[in-house]
């Protein structure tokens, strides 16, 4: 007889708690959606600015040229000074894989949502295939340079003993060290990835301006690419501060910039190429049609 009101009050309290939690979840989802929308809009506007993109090239050059001077003002025992640090192993050594995964998803969504054409989507994704070929070709070229300029040494307590072994393979097989001119492949790859990602992500501003579908998944993928681009900039700075010789880093960055210029700055503007980012995605304005 006395338990009825108690049970009813308990059920009422439970209902109110569930309703309160439901409202809280809705508010949190609304806030997350608003932040996602605002963040993607601002990042797209920033990366889509031609002036800021030119300044970005100057920023990368300054990082590589003047960044090594910071080694005299930073703690040499920090985690980023170790070759075995988490970021170096998990991200820098696999930078192209991370870039292809994140950027490939972004290009796939942007191109397909804008055109609904598989052939056009495949053409734009082929830029990543070209990038992979550039990365592989550059890596082999760097190894060839090291082979052609190197000599075989045996470490001794008194110093180094020079051996007349003909190539690096036989030198390493004998347990010795091969020392040649080593272009920084990490500096090359990070520079190339930074320029490539900035170029590809810049198209999102124009995509939004044309009112094309831009739901939460696409905006989230875009922001993940922006975060990865920021990480590459940070790790490039760490690389030039803590690792490699100065000229090795400068040459690596110069080759990465030259590779970007040959592809995005030159070849992709030709009709027989994969095309520049955004090519064929957006309807031409009436004024352009009248002008033509």
UniProtKB/Swiss-Prot annotation:
State the organism named in the record: Mus musculus
UniProt KW keywords:
Endoplasmic reticulum, Lipid metabolism, Membrane, Transmembrane, Transmembrane helix
Q: Where is the active site?
A: 186, 244
Which of the residues are on side Cytoplasmic? 40-54, 116-141, 209-220, 271-292
Give an example GO molecular function: coenzyme A diphosphatase activity
Q: Summarize the record's disruption phenotype note.
A: Knockout mice show no significant differences in heart size or function.
> Which tissues does the record link to its expression?
Predominantly expressed in skeletal muscle and at lower levels in the heart (at protein level). In the heart, mRNA expression levels do not correlate well with protein levels, suggesting post-transcriptional regulation in this organ.
Q: Which domain of life is it from?
A: Eukaryota
Residues flagged as site, Important for catalytic activity: 248
* Record-annotated membrane-spanning stretches: 19-39, 55-75, 95-115, 142-162, 188-208, 221-241, 250-270
| Encoding gene, per UniProt annotation | Fitm1
Instruction: Cite the ranges annotated as topological domain Lumenal.
Output: 1-18, 76-94, 163-187, 242-249
Query: Which protein, by its recorded name, is this?
Result: Fat storage-inducing transmembrane protein 1
Taxonomy-wise, where does this protein's organism fall, top ranks first? Eukaryota, Metazoa, Chordata, Craniata, Vertebrata
Q: Where is the signal peptide?
A: none
What function is annotated for this protein? Answer: Plays an important role in the formation of lipid droplets (LDs) which are storage organelles at the center of lipid and energy homeostasis. Directly binds to diacylglycerol (DAGs) and triacylglycerol.
What are its GO biological-process terms? fat cell differentiation; lipid droplet formation; lipid droplet organization; phospholipid biosynthetic process
What are the coiled-coil residue ranges?
none
Membrane topology label: Multi-pass membrane protein
Compartment annotation: Endoplasmic reticulum membrane
A single GO cellular-component term on record = endoplasmic reticulum membrane
Family affiliation: Belongs to the FIT family. FIT1 subfamily.
Q: Which InterPro entries does this chain map to?
A: FIT, FIT1, FITM1/2
